[in-house]
């Protein structure tokens, strides 16, 4: 006989999950520790549930099975990434194990967790106390059949109970990443299409026949205000498109406009500040030459949380920050001078500056160095005068 904790951890491992994240909390901590022991690896724990969720989602989009182990309260913290991940979809199976401390013995408060899951619209099942191993295994195939993240709701009071199970041979992922910006770039360009696809997936209908929109050609297909931004950023992207990595992640910020032709410089995008954890997930899935693009506001709002994860995992991530001291995507609200520099002080050895982002020679020199080194690089392009 084995405990439910042990069975869940074995099921995750045997399902072939390559990237498994966890933020400490009742239930998830115990299962994660057991998973680390089974896999003979000391996987790092994450500090923030939105980041942990997004890392796993990035790995799934890049073609590797993944899982996130978090408390129900943590799912609430990750909600922005959750709803955007449903619009972006998945490639390989992505299972979110949500641990429900129903009586709040180790949590902030008691709340209606099923209502949260239903409101987020993430497909979920409650773990039943029979054939636990199969239920966790099936969750990965369910995710892959829907091409969506799915959740399994687990009562923490059940984790010490005992069951028998028959282990299966460890699965090998056979999913390959394919660039698809119409599906994977969440933002103002394709929301109606992505919503129709999501509704079809949730209702069990065929979504492949839904008419796909045509990506805008930049700058000609854009409103005048966006054309001005494109002209400002065009010299940098004319160089970046030649040096870009295997996967480039973006934020829902103005730089993600360059996902469209003829630049094709962004591949995946979910929420503001999500580019860095998405890129970490892609790196962990095997795409080592990965770039994350972000605006200064997006980076300060949430992106910097991902830097901690990249450092503790020793990932040689490449990050490009567009520093214009404003929240350009939401109307140009000013960002106080000096805050970006203060945040980056702790990462000074990795920081490189593009002082004149209209000078293609300087751009080429800085980006070339960043792309070639086997270390993290944080490139800051100075658009404060633009």
Annotate each language-model stretch with its function.
Residues 16-20, 41-42, 247, 266:
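Short active-site oxyanion
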């Amino acid at each position: 006989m084995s405990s439910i904790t042990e069975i869940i951890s074995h099921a995750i491992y045997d399902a072939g999950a390559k990237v498994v994240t966890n933020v400490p909390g009742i239930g998830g901590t115990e299962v994660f520790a057991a998973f680390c022991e089974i896999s003979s690896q000391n996987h790092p724990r994450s500090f923030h549930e939105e980041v942990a969720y997004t890392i796993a989602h990035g790995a799934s989009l890049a073609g590797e099975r993944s899982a996130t182990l978090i408390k129900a309260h943590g799912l609430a913290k990750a909600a922005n990434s959750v709803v955007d991940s449903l619009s972006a979809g998945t490639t390989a199976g992505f299972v979110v194990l949500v641990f429900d401390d129903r009586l709040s013995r180790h949590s902030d408060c008691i709340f209606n967790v099923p209502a949260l899951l239903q409101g987020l619209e993430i497909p979920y099942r409650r773990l039943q106390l029979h054939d636990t191993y199969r239920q966790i295994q099936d969750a990965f195939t369910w995710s892959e059949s829907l091409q969506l993240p799915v959740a399994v709701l687990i009562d923490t009071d059940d984790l010490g109970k005992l069951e028998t199970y028959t282990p299966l041979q460890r699965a090998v992922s056979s999913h390959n990443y394919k660039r698809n910006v119409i599906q994977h770039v969440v933002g103002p360009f394709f929301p109606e299409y992505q919503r129709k696809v999501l509704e079809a997936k949730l209702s069990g209908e065929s979504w492949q026949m839904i008419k796909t929109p045509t990506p805008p050609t930049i700058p000609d297909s854009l409103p005048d205000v966006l054309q001005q931004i494109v002209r400002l950023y065009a010299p940098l992207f004319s160089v970046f498109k030649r040096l870009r990595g295997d996967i480039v992640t973006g934020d829902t910020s103005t730089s993600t406009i360059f996902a469209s032709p003829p630049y094709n410089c962004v591949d995946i995008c979910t929420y503001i500040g999500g580019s860095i954890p998405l890129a970490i997930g892609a790196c962990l899935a095997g795409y080592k030459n990965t770039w994350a693009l972000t605006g200064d506001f997006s980076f300060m709002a949430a992106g910097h949380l991902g830097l901690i994860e990249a450092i503790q995992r020793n990932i040689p991530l490449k990050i490009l920050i567009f520093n214009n001291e404003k929240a350009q995507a939401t109307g140009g609200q000013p960002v106080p001078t000096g805050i970006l520099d203060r945040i980056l002080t702790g990462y000074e050895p990795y920081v490189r500056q593009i002082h004149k982002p209209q000078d293609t020679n300087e751009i080429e020199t800085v980006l070339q160095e960043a792309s070639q080194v086997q270390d993290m690089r944080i490139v800051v392009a100075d658009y404060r005068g633009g």
